[in-house]
């Protein structure tokens, strides 16, 4: 089979994906693709498309769509970097294929003409891995029905002995698909370590879940540490040396990308550190209304961060968006206190970390009495729920530090939560 026999066919991406590997090898050989046997199926399909497009004087376009306020958009290879923009997407193409910000688009682009900076997308082959026609039928995120979380994300990792923190969370503050949880933490209470453990646990226990770690106004070395410590998750960051506009733009893009995945029935977990810093950044970029709350916070500044957090939901039609966001307290800033008070009660789960427990080097520094999950009966088995209620009744009169020490001591003697609950019965 020669190139002239294959190139005119210009097979769509979906047809290439449906072919078996030997058929793709045959096409690749005819197109003169080198080392095609070393490529995985998806990469091979893209390589074939690239060769076919090149033969017709076009280029393969692939990237995340960012739609501007003027109606047109750009494909950028990097989820966050506008400098990676390579292809212009006209308003007509966006309307024709019902494209939205955050969509991952594969298609063909006309190469830039003289004095043009970008090529232009002329044909869409796939949207988020779907056929373009199927993508047109997608429901809108805001039209989907939110329900209470009813499937627990079990964080316990049987393969490691260093899992007491996650075992405690599983029992006392169970996290479900679609949870909207706040991790309320003073400085140096172990919130970053807890987030890392949760991220690693979910990526390992639930391969079907897309995990995004969003770090806003964070130290650069913390970002590096997260990227090296967390495997299988997308770590997206805007460090403290970036302007507040960049913080907000990064968060907006992550928000839109997560919504696109959920619209197709996927499951996403966003770990945000922190909602407080995101609200601070949004306060700086929001046009002043003249109505200022205590601490210098504009009354309109919390609208978008609340929209971000409020997107967390379990979807009746399928899919879920789970958000675990840290809220900073006891920082000495009146603004931080106001932000926390505004977000208090918006979540359906709270993990409250205690400075007193941290000072006594008790980790997780979880205040058992103040932490909990709403409608936990939908997540835990009835027999587990009864034992948890009994445990909470026993420790209700204890000092939080003593209660956590006792609980960790008992749990440390068992290999997993099943054994611990069986021991409680005894």
From Swiss-Prot:
Protein name (database record): Transcription termination factor Rho
Domain of life: Bacteria
Keywords attached to this entry: ATP-binding, Helicase, Hydrolase, Nucleotide-binding, RNA-binding, Transcription, Transcription regulation, Transcription termination
CDD domains, per the entry: Rho_CSD, rho_factor_C
Residues covered by the Rho RNA-BD domain: 58-131
Quaternary structure and partners: Homohexamer. The homohexamer assembles into an open ring structure.
UniProt cross-references to PANTHER family, sorted A to Z: TRANSCRIPTION TERMINATION FACTOR RHO
GO molecular function, one term: ATP binding
Pfam families per the UniProt record, alphabetical: ATP-synt_ab, Rho_N, Rho_RNA_bind
Family label: Belongs to the Rho family.
EC category: hydrolase
Alphabetized HAMAP family for the sequence: Rho
Disulfide bonds: none
Residues that bind ATP: 176-181, 188-193, 219
GO biological process, one term: DNA-templated transcription termination
Keyword ATP-binding belongs to the record: yes
Gene field: rho
E.C. no: 3.6.4.-
Function: Facilitates transcription termination by a mechanism that involves Rho binding to the nascent RNA, activation of Rho's RNA-dependent ATPase activity, and release of the mRNA from the DNA template.
